[in-house]
């Protein structure tokens, strides 16, 4: 601050959250029932199609997106919808980095890849596909895969001393790795 160091903590200390922690893990294998990778036969294709369109993970979110102004600030590169009729959802956020003077062509890109149905069945498979999906979206938007940096947001039930409780975050970390 004003040329003086106020706090100087090592990165190694910050990575531990201040204390060494260990936990036992009992790994839970996903059920064979509900396996999303198994081929299923559908008798009523039209009914299944309409059912899929009503799924919150598939249906249009245009009404929600229109509540936000994507043109605020001069940094936005992609609008929320693109294409000839402005109806195609963009799969990545791209914004120029702010600079004090002059122009910049440097951007930051962000995407996502979470599949709640797959992750509910298997946190491991959900994490694998989350990484692959988010990388594919960045590359499709013009990003360089070798410069991608990851951040993972995780939401698991409260952990305690029960080793089976640690199965979900442990499996997800293995999948993301």
Enumerate the predicted regions with their spans.
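Glycine/proline-enriched, intrinsically flexible loops and inter-domain linkers
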Residues: 1-177
């Amino acid at each position: 601050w004003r040329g003086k160091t106020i706090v100087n903590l090592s990165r190694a200390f910050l990575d531990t959250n201040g204390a060494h922690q260990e936990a036992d893990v009992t790994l839970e294998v996903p059920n064979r029932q509900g396996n999303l990778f198994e081929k299923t036969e559908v008798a009523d294709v039209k009914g299944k199609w309409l059912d899929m369109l009503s799924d919150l993970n598939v249906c249009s979110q245009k009404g929600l997106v229109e509540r936000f102004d994507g043109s605020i600030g001069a940094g936005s590169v992609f609008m929320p919808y693109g294409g000839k009729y402005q109806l195609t959802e963009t799969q990545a956020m791209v914004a120029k980095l702010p600079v004090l003077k002059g122009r910049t062509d440097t951007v930051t890109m962000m995407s996502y890849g979470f599949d709640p149905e797959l992750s509910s069945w298997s946190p491991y498979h959900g994490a694998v596909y989350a990484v692959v999906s988010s990388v594919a979206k960045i590359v499709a938007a013009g990003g360089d895969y070798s410069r991608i940096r990851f951040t993972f947001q995780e939401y698991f039930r409260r952990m305690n001393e029960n080793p089976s409780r640690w199965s979900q975050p442990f499996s997800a970390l293995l999948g993301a790795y």
